[in-house]
């Protein structure tokens, strides 16, 4: 006798179909590349797909200056990485709020140094032009241009791989999370680093629904139940909200996470957490105030692709098709940092 309610049955059937589809996809994939964006940006290579990132606007008008990498010693206290795709309408107010906050913190403490890296993910509007003009007024802002639209995951990955900060915050360009929530994540990560320098703090909306602090639509709440089941299948445990675009990494954690990240679009967050938990990093959730922005980029088709990606993460890591590089194979030992 089936005691499950109709909705639970529907979710179970969808998950089962996705599992079969992804398994067949993995089975039929004769070659699954273990290369990541890191292999095309940091490692020396003659591959024609090699990507070179230069700071924009250039600090030197006569030459292009390459972005530093996360494997160099930190130069500032914190880096805010902002992935941006067609954000011409929202990037200015977001930068206004963020710069005001960071300047206030810096005025209170001279050791609070910062940078913002806006990663333009192949925008078709004038996002890059807006950020460039903003950066002329605020030299702590750097524009990193992707050669084409590669996905939010790739944008975050590129920004974090080229950060100078001791702490690296991933933050969405839509302003859904108030920027001063950074302080809550900052406090938590400092407590975690007394145990392990490799640490992540995840901004979370899941803890706040009872307190009505998170204003989420019923549709997203329903879809969240199904995704939570898939996230568990993918191998993420103990994290209730993997998808909030507000996460803080130590530099030491970033050096392991982003060279090993394969997923380049919406579903990269769970993969980072799978990598972190395989490395036994310290991972914690902190409630943040969050408001859903009406002009959401996530469409139904994107949600389906994300669900397939989650099952793909589970299969590829378990089958050894994707791996977390051992220390001897990573740039950490090569750079001797």
From Swiss-Prot:
This protein's UniProt keywords: Endoplasmic reticulum, Glycosyltransferase, Membrane, Signal-anchor, Transferase, Transmembrane, Transmembrane helix
Lumenal topological domain residue ranges: 1-6
Record field: catalytic activity: a di-trans,poly-cis-dolichyl phosphate + UDP-alpha-D-glucose = a di-trans,poly-cis-dolichyl beta-D-glucosyl phosphate + UDP
Class of this enzyme: transferase
Pathway: Protein modification; protein glycosylation
Compartments in which it is found: Endoplasmic reticulum membrane
Any one GO CC term of the record: endoplasmic reticulum membrane
GO MF, any single term: dolichyl-phosphate beta-glucosyltransferase activity
Parts of the chain on the Cytoplasmic side: 28-337
Classification via Gene3D superfamilies: Spore Coat Polysaccharide Biosynthesis Protein SpsA, Chain A
CDD domains attached to this UniProt entry: DPG_synthase
Main localization of the protein described in the UniProt heading: endoplasmic reticulum
InterPro entries for this protein: DPG_synthase, Glyco_trans_2-like, Nucleotide-diphossugar_trans
TM helices/strands, residue ranges: 7-27
EC nos: 2.4.1.117
A single BP term in Gene Ontology: protein N-linked glycosylation
Membrane-topology descriptor: Single-pass membrane protein
Keyword ATP-binding applies: no
Homology family: Belongs to the glycosyltransferase 2 family.
Described function: Dolichyl-phosphate beta-glucosyltransferase involved in the glycosylation of glycoproteins through the synthesis of dolichyl beta-D-glucosyl phosphate which serves as a sugar donor for transfer of three glucose residues to the Man-9-GlcNAc-2-PP-dolichol precursor to N-glycans.
UniProt name for this protein: Dolichyl-phosphate beta-glucosyltransferase ALG5C
């Amino acid at each position: 006798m089936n005691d499950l309610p109709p909705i639970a049955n529907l979710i179970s059937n969808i998950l089962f179909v996705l599992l079969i589809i992804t398994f067949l996809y993995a089975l039929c994939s004769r070659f699954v590349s273990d290369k990541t964006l890191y292999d095309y940006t940091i490692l020396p290579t003659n591959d024609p797909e090699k990507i070179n990132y230069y700071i924009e606007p250039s600090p030197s008008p006569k030459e292009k200056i390459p972005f530093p990498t996360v494997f160099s010693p930190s130069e500032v206290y914190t880096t805010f990485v902002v992935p941006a795709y067609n954000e011409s309408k929202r990037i200015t107010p977001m930068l206004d709020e963020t710069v005001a906050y960071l300047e206030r913190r810096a005025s209170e403490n001279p050791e609070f140094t910062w940078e913002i890296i806006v990663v333009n993910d192949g925008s078709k509007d004038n996002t890059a032009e807006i950020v460039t003009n903003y950066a002329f007024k605020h030299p702590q802002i750097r524009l990193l241009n992707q050669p084409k639209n590669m996905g939010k995951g790739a944008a975050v990955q590129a920004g974090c791989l080229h950060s100078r900060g001791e702490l690296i915050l991933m933050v969405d360009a839509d302003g859904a999370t108030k920027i001063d929530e950074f302080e809550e994540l900052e406090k938590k990560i400092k407590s975690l680093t007394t145990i392990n320098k490799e640490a992540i703090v995840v901004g979370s909306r899941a803890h706040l629904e009872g307190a009505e602090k998170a204003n989420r639509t019923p549709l997203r709440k329903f879809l969240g139940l199904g995704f939570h089941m898939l996230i568990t299948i993918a191998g993420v445990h103990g994290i209730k909200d993997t998808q909030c675009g507000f996460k803080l990494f130590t530099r030491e954690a970033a050096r392991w996470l982003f060279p090993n990240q394969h997923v380049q679009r919406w579903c990269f967050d769970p993969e980072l957490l799978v990598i972190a938990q395989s490395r036994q990093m310290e991972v914690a959730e902190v409630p943040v105030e969050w408001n859903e922005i009406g002009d959401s980029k996530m469409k139904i088709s994107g949600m389906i692709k994300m669900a397939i990606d989650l099952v793909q993460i589970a299969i590829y890591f378990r089958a050894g098709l994707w791996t977390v590089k051992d220390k001897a194979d990573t740039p950490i030992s090569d750079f001797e940092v």
